[in-house]
Swiss-Prot record:
One of its GO terms (molecular function) is DNA binding. This is DNA-directed RNA polymerase subunit beta. It is an enzyme of class 2 (transferase). Its EC number is 2.7.7.6. It comes from the Bacteria. Pfam families: RNA_pol_Rpb2_1, RNA_pol_Rpb2_2, RNA_pol_Rpb2_3, RNA_pol_Rpb2_45, RNA_pol_Rpb2_6, RNA_pol_Rpb2_7. NCBIfam families: PRK00405.1, rpoB. CDD domains: RNA_pol_B_RPB2. One of its GO terms (biological process) is DNA-templated transcription. The RNAP catalytic core consists of 2 alpha, 1 beta, 1 beta' and 1 omega subunit. When a sigma factor is associated with the core the holoenzyme is formed, which can initiate transcription. GO terms for cellular component: DNA-directed RNA polymerase complex. Gene3D superfamilies: 2.40.50.100, 2.40.50.150, 3.90.1100.10, DNA-directed RNA polymerase, beta subunit, external 1 domain, DNA-directed RNA polymerase, subunit 2, domain 6, RNA polymerase alpha subunit dimerisation domain, RNA polymerase Rpb2, domain 2.
């Protein structure tokens, strides 16, 4: 076989026959860099320093000089007291090694963090005395190598936030009355007061200071020290400024300052000094106002200024230049000429990615630490004034509680710190690459309009246009494109190949969205000659605003780096994406993240070449850190002897529970004595095979209807998949119980449980905890626990007997941990923590027991399956394999799909995948080169493949239609020499029940199917009696509360329409909230009597009480006009309940744990 190209450019990945034609000059960058690099910058660790050094050598200009923590400590230093006699400053933060490992933290519910120390210097300016001390600043949560944080034992991810960049923005809107375009402008800082300018329909230029009332802009200019003559000299040619000056009542600077003060602080006596200080504090005080470097950069760029990038406050020049730009825009000018260049005058598009930036993890945590330090600063100031100057040391001034609290608050409660989605490795990877416009300082779901959510041309290569949730968050949450990176200002850049004089070079340049607008960019699949020139004189290229047209080859400045540049990782794993409708591709991207890891992972026959990188970067496989030889392999450990003589032992995790209850299990794939290279996969994780992402299974699929059982997206499945555990998965649930200190004494974990038979306790050990390996079903005891009961008042006789015969055994009740409803499985692990053993437990807890129960779930009807093209469905019927339609050689198909699901949904990719899957399974060989497609395949080395080959068809650069239809006639025969599928990809199928052939040939092939996390076992639910709501006494709702089924308004209408009066009455009373009726009916059923008349529903009594609380006199009258008394309890109910052994005095359980 000709050496087929390897799709995964990484030589360590498995071989795939690739249909790609385009050579990519750049590898996909590390997919977790968005998280890890940002956090490295925050800490300023060695990795970050090395990266900065490398960038400096490469000549990059936008590199940050300081780490995130250095920036804040420098910002806050020095903290001076009110008189300026003492100051406290901070420098040189450092971290000690973490106290506990990641594993210990997960195990013991702790936070994975390292102690942070800072050198604090206290200076007494009067005496010149300096006291220096290293101060502990609290434990700082650390990021794991996988880009996650471990907070209180659970893995969390901090999502990057998309926000509007600080800077100056010009906008325009049409005035309805005068049909004039009205221009406005906002200067938005990173923190501080906004400054807004606007021109109204009478050409009056107004300014709003800090969102207050509008004033003439000339008042602000005069307050800054300008005279009327200076204003006229600079802006005299513009009608708008002259009109504004006429309406301006103020005379000079003092007058203008007082006028501003009156508008901002109405009711306070205006003085010149107060007004000056107010304006100073709003815009010119670095403590109160900060544009941040990015804001300064944007203002300089927009207004053509050359102010130093470290200037964080506004300057007079900024305000003048902004007014200048605004009046020029209003006057209809198109260009602004400055000494160092010409700048366009135009309004801004706020949805453009040049105006939206990312706040990554580092910056989000930095802002939180800044908040904590600002709170600490107040404490330090107060302590400086109250403590004795001689006795002051940095340690006595500093209170670290606000800093620690604000960091903890961020990780625990912020909208952007999220419980990690760990269903499978792709879900975790995508979660870490997520971009959210929600969160503090961002948008809110309700306010976000259509424009913000829509795809924008500037998203190209930066944010995926496909992957976003369905529902209320659509367009507000996105995913970073595969090649994108974030620069030091927080803008997303995407790489392009430089084109010089019509020749493509291998130089790669990263461009931000606003730089890209200036260039003409060709697409990645433009035909190219071997010498790097364009094959055609006219090239299809993009210009500003996403418009594309045919341009001369010499006009092109850059070229896309790869066809998959515009999509995210999950979307790049959909083969034949180019043949799918975008709505279905969106569902396909999202559903890959919901695939549960199966018992045996199987990589797709038809992939895209992205599988290897996605799996290795997600961090759930084990990679060799150095090249060497494998010395020792067991299920739990792999030891590698590196070439430099060092040994490294890798821990292999077995059957762990993920956040979503799926199974995290790693398996070694290397053998003793095997040579391994650096970066090679040593052990597979969940949903990976040989280091490739393997989320589902390759199944033999037929597109045909089957007795209507696959109507409306339902799926018919073969029993083989159940018997052979092909779609079985393991799910692990964690059950926890703690023994607390109560007012009546401590709770106890024990085997001695009152009123429980010995066989129920058979699987418990002597401590009362279930043994590992026990099979349990719902209701079984996992951990025996008793709680002291309140002593009742004793009668004198009892007291006498107690005094004679000594203390009776104290009363306890059974509060054991039982398996919840509908759950079962095998106990695979038990963890016991106790205060006596020295474990750290929450206050009031003496002992904590965790039990892990695993269950193997076979595929069953009601489970949800999906392909990668948004083709999802629910299993309606599982047929015995002998009844499934079968091929001519007797092979029954695995899955029967409805062909009507394809044309309307326009996801034809699934059909292409199915045909190519058949080809990959059986192999092919192309003879001759008498056709264009044959020559193309020969050029890329894909003209032959043995049976069971894996193929790669990259996004937008994959196998073409003519190649697939051509290859279907070149497929290799099977062992019997038969070719079962004709050149159209269709096979003759026979009905498994009768053996008769179906009338028409049917499309048959191999497709990749995922089992989604929506499993019927988690959804099915039934209740006989259970908890009731406290007030209305109606059953609770939902499976989690063990609730009932709501019989709603529309269902009532249905019964009313049938006139089913008695059924309706029962539903409204005894089946719901007629308390007395419930008990009486139970009694009647037990005694075999007729069902008595229903009583009055409790919610009716609640309604009356509610009306009475509004001071309305409400009475209930009987038919004969007598007032009915609503008594709360009836004696015979209590009597009946007592006879039936129902304890009405006990508290009803209010949650499923207690049921």
């Amino acid at each position: 076989m000709a050496a087929s190209r390897i799709a995964s450019a990484n030589a360590l990945g498995p071989n795939r026959v690739s249909f790609a034609r385009i050579k990519e000059p750049l590898e996909v960058p590390n997919l977790l860099a968005l998280q890890t690099e940002s956090f490295d910058w925050l800490l300023g660790n060695e990795r970050w320093r090395a990266r900065v050094e490398a960038a400096r050598k490469a000549g990059r200009k936008d590199i940050p000089e300081q780490s995130g923590l250095e920036e804040i400590f420098e910002e806050i230093s020095p903290i001076e007291d009110f008189s300026g006699t003492m100051s406290l400053s901070f420098r040189d933060h450092r971290f000690e090694p973490p106290k506990y490992s990641e594993e210990e933290c997960k195990d013991k519910d702790m936070t994975y963090s390292a102690p942070m120390f800072v050198t604090a210097e206290f200076i007494n300016n009067d005496t010149g005395e300096i006291k220096s001390q290293t101060v502990f600043m609290g434990d700082f949560p650390l990021m794991t190598a996988k880009g996650t944080f471990i907070i209180n034992g659970t893995e969390r991810v901090v999502v990057s936030q998309l926000v509007r960049s600080p800077g100056v923005y010009f906008d325009s809107q049409m005035d309805k009355s005068s049909d004039k375009e009205l221009y406005g402008c906002k200067i938005i800082p990173s923190r501080g007061a906004w400054l807004e300018f606007e021109i109204d329909k009478r050409d009056f230029v107004g300014v709003r200071i800090d969102r207050k009332r509008k004033q003439a802009v000339t008042i602000l200019l005069k307050a800054l020290g300008w005279t009327t003559d200076q204003i006229l000299e600079r802006f005299g040619e513009y009608e708008s400024i002259r009109a504004t000056l006429e309406k301006d009542p103020t005379a000079g600077t003092d007058d203008a300052l007082l006028d501003i003060y009156r508008k901002l602080r109405p009711g306070e006596p205006p003085t010149k000094e107060a007004a000056q200080a107010l304006l100073e504090n709003l815009y010119f005080n670095p403590k109160r106002y900060d544009l941040a470097k990015v804001g300064r950069y944007k203002i300089n760029k927009k207004l053509g200024l050359e102010i130093d990038i470290t200037q964080g406050t506004l300057t007079e020049e900024d305000i003048v230049a902004t007014v200048d730009y605004l009046v020029r825009l209003h006057a209809g000018e198109k260009e602004l000429v400055r000494p160092h260049g010409t700048f366009p005058i135009e309004v801004d598009d706020i949805d453009h990615f040049g105006n939206r930036r990312l706040r990554t993890v580092g910056e989000l945590i930095q802002n939180q630490v800044r908040l904590g330090l600002a709170r600490m600063e107040r404490v330090v100031r107060e302590r400086m004034t109250t403590q004795d100057v001689e006795a002051i040391t940095p340690q006595t001034l500093i209170n670290i509680r606000p800093v620690v609290a604000s960091i903890r608050e961020f990780f625990g409660t912020s909208q952007l710190s999220q419980f990690m989605d760990q269903t499978n490795p792709l879900a975790g990877l995508t979660h870490k690459r997520r971009l959210s416009a929600l969160g503090p300082g961002g948008l809110s779901r309700e306010r976000a309009g259509f424009e913000v959510r829509d795809v924008h041309p500037s998203h190209y290569g930066r944010m995926c246009p496909i992957e976003t949730p369905e529902g209320p968050n659509i367009g507000l949450i996105g995913s970073l494109a595969a090649y994108a990176r974030v620069n030091s200002f927080g803008f997303i850049e995407t790489p392009y190949r430089k084109v010089v004089d019509g020749r493509i070079t291998d130089e790669v340049v990263y461009l931000t969205a606003d730089e890209e607008d200036r260039y003409v960019i060709a697409q990645a699949n433009t035909p190219v000659n071997p010498d790097g020139t364009f094959a055609e004189s006219q090239v299809l290229a993009r210009r500003k605003g996403g418009e594309f047209e045919s341009v001369a080859a010499e006009e092109v400045h850059y070229m896309d780096i790869s066809p998959r540049q515009m999509v995210s990782v999950a979307t790049a794993m959909i083969p034949f994406l180019e043949h799918d409708d975008a709505n279905r591709a969106l569902m396909g991207s999202n559903m890959q993240r919901q695939a549960v890891p199966l018992l045996r992972a199987e990589a797709p026959l038809v992939g895209t070449g992205m599988e290897y990188r996605a799996a290795t970067d997600a961090g759930d496989v084990i990679l060799a850190e150095k090249s060497g030889v494998v010395e020792d392999v067991t299920a739990d450990y792999i030891t590698v002897l590196a070439d430099d003589g060092t040994r490294k032992t890798y821990r292999v995790h077995k059957f762990r529970r993920t956040n979503q209850g799926t199974c995290f299990n790693q398996r070694p794939i290397v053998e003793e004595g095997q040579r391994v290279e650096e970066g090679q996969v040593l052990a597979d994780g969940p949903s990976t095979e040989a280091g490739e992402m393997a989320l589902g299974k390759n199944l033999l699929v037929a597109y045909m209807s089957w007795e209507g059982h696959n109507y409306e997206d339902a799926i018919v499945l073969s029993q083989r998949l159940v018997e052979e555990d092909i779609l079985s998965s393991i799910h692990i649930e964690e059950h926890e119980v703690d023994a607390r200190e109560t007012k009546l004494g401590p709770e106890e974990i024990t085997r001695e449980i009152p009123n429980v038979s010995e066989e129920v306790l058979a699987d418990l050990d002597e401590r009362g905890i279930i043994r590992i390996g026990a099979e349990v079903v719902d209701g079984d005891i996992l951990v025996g626990k008793v709680t002291p009961k309140g002593e009742t008042e004793l009668t004198p006789e009892e007291r006498l007997l107690r005094a004679i015969f000594g203390e009776k055994a104290r009363e306890v009740r059974d509060t054991s941990l039982k398996v919840p409803h509908g759950e079962s499985g095998k106990v695979i692990g038990v963890r016991v923590f106790s205060r006596e053993e020295g474990d750290e437990l929450p206050p009031g807890v003496n002992e904590l027991v965790r039990v892990y129960v695993a269950q193997k779930r076979k595929i069953t009807d009601g489970d949800k399956l999906a392909g990668r093209h948004g083709n999802k469905g629910v299993i309606a019927k599982i047929l015995p394999k002998e009844d499934m339609p079968f091929l001519e050689d007797g092979t029954p198909v695995d899955i029967v799909l409805n062909p009507l699901g394809v044309p309307g949904r326009m996801n034809i990719g699934q059909i292409m995948e199915m045909h190519l899957g058949w080809l990959a399974k059986h192999g092919w060989k192309v003879e001759g080169d008498d056709a264009e497609w044959k020559r193309r395949l020969r050029d890329i080395g894909a003209h032959e493949a043995p049976p069971n080959s894996k193929v790669a068809t990259p996004v937008f650069d994959g196998a073409r239609e003519d190649e697939i239809s051509g290859l279907l006639s070149c497929v290799l025969p099977d062992q019997d020499g038969d070719i079962l599928v004709n050149k159209f990809g269709k096979a003759k199928l026979y009905d498994g029940r009768t053996g008769e052939p179906f009338k028409e040939p049917v499309a048959v092939g191999y497709a990749y199917f995922l089992k989604l996390h929506h499993l019927v076992d988690d959804k099915i639910h039934a209740r006989s009696t259970g908890p009731y709501s406290m007030i209305t006494q109606q059953p609770l709702g939902g499976k989690a509360q063990f609730g009932g089924q709501r019989f709603g308004e529309m269902e009532v209408w249905a019964l009313e329409a049938y006139g089913a009066a008695y059924a309706l009455q029962e539903l409204l009373t005894i089946k719901s909230d007629d308390i007395n009726g419930r008990v009486k009916v139970y009694e009647a059923i037990v005694k075999g009597e007729n069902i008595p008349e229903p009583g009055i529903p409790e919610s009716f009594k609640v309604l009356i009480k509610e009306m009475q609380s509004l001071c309305l006199n409400v009475e209930v009258l009987s038919r004969d006009g007598m007032s009915i008394e609503m008594r709360d309890s009836e004696e015979d109910v209590f009597r009946a309940a007592e006879e039936l052994g129902i304890d009405l005095g006990r508290r009803e359980p209010s949650s499923v744990e207690e049921v």
